[in-house]
Swiss-Prot record:
GO molecular function terms listed in the Swiss-Prot or TrEMBL record: phosphatase activity
Keywords recorded for this protein, A-Z: Hydrolase
Site note Transition state stabilizer, residues: 162
Record: active site: 15 (tele-phosphohistidine intermediate), 92 (proton donor/acceptor)
Entry superkingdom: Eukaryota
Enzyme nomenclature, EC number: 3.1.3.-
GO cellular component: cytoplasm
Protein's UniProt name: Probable phosphatase SPBPB21E7.02c
Stored Gene3D superfamilies: Phosphoglycerate mutase-like (3.40.50.1240)
Family indicated by similarity: Belongs to the phosphoglycerate mutase family. BPG-dependent PGAM subfamily.
UniProt-listed InterPro entries: His_Pase_superF_clade-1, His_PPase_superfam, PGM_Phosphatase
C-alpha cells in the first residue's frame, strides 16, 4: 500500500450542541449557549494542544459550519490558513427537519467565505438517492466520503460532521438502531475530537482508532 495512505490521519469532530439536541428537531437549528461553551473549549484545547492539520472537511449544515469556524479559528485565520472543503457527503443521516439542509443560496449568504460548489450535484439538499435517509442508503453513502478522504493529497485531515453519521463512517451503526435517536453512550459527545488512521482492508476503506486519542 502507498505509504502516504497508510499514514493518513483523520480527526473526527462532532458539532457543538445545537438547539435541536435539547429541544424540538426543527429546521436549521443554531448552536445554543452550551454549544458556544463547547466550541470555545475545543478551540482552547487546540491552542494548548496543537495538532497538525492540512485541510478541514466540513458538512454543509449550519451547525457544523458554525462549529468549524470557531473551534478551528486559530487554523483558519493564521497567516497561511488551513484550506476548507465543504462536502455534502458528510451531512447527517436522519430524516428529522434539523437534518435537512437549507437551500444552497441561503447557506452561501450565511457563510460567504466558503466554496459550496461540491454541493451543486443535482440532488443536494434533497434527501433522496445518495442522500437518502434509510439505513441501506446511509451505509452505502458512508463508503464514498472515505474514498474521498483517501483521494485527497493532504495527510492530516479534520472532518466536522454529525453524531449518527459518525457511526456510519465507523461502521458502528446497525440496522436495528434508531437513526433518529441514539443513547449518549453510543455517540460522540458534542465537540468531541477523536483520531484515526484511514486504511484500506482489501475490501473497503476503514477508520482505525489511534491509541493517543
Amino acid at each position: 500500500m502507498d505509504k502516504n495512505l497508510e499514514e493518513k490521519v483523520i480527526w473526527l469532530v462532532r458539532h457543538a450542541q445545537a438547539e435541536h439536541n435539547v429541544g424540538p428537531p426543527g429546521n436549521h437549528r443554531r448552536i445554543n449557549q452550551v454549544g458556544i461553551k463547547q466550541w470555545e473549549a475545543l478551540h482552547n484545547w487546540l491552542v494548548d494542544n496543537p495538532i497538525p492539520i492540512d485541510v478541514i472537511v466540513c458538512s454543509p449544515l449550519r451547525r457544523t459550519l458554525q462549529t468549524m469556524e470557531i473551534s478551528f479559528k486559530s487554523y483558519i485565520h493564521k497567516e497561511l490558513p488551513v484550506p476548507i472543503k465543504i462536502s455534502p457527503l458528510f451531512e447527517e443521516s436522519g430524516n428529522w427537519p434539523c437534518d435537512c439542509a437549507m437551500d444552497l443560496s441561503s447557506t452561501e449568504k450565511l457563510f460567504p467565505d466558503y466554496d459550496f460548489s461540491s454541493c451543486y450535484d443535482d440532488i443536494y439538499p434533497l434527501r433522496r438517492g445518495l442522500y437518502g435517509t434509510t439505513y441501506d442508503e446511509n451505509y452505502c453513502r458512508a463508503q464514498k466520503p472515505l474514498k474521498h478522504l483517501a483521494s485527497l493529497h493532504e495527510k492530516n485531515i479534520v472532518v466536522v460532521t454529525h453524531s449518527v453519521y459518525l457511526r456510519f463512517l465507523l461502521r458502528e451503526q446497525r440496522p436495528e438502531d434508531n437513526m433518529n435517536f441514539m443513547p449518549p453512550e453510543k455517540v460522540f459527545r458534542n465537540c468531541e475530537i477523536r483520531k484515526y488512521n484511514l486504511c484500506h482492508t482489501g475490501f473497503q476503506w476503514e477508520l482505525i482508532p489511534l491509541i493517543d486519542n
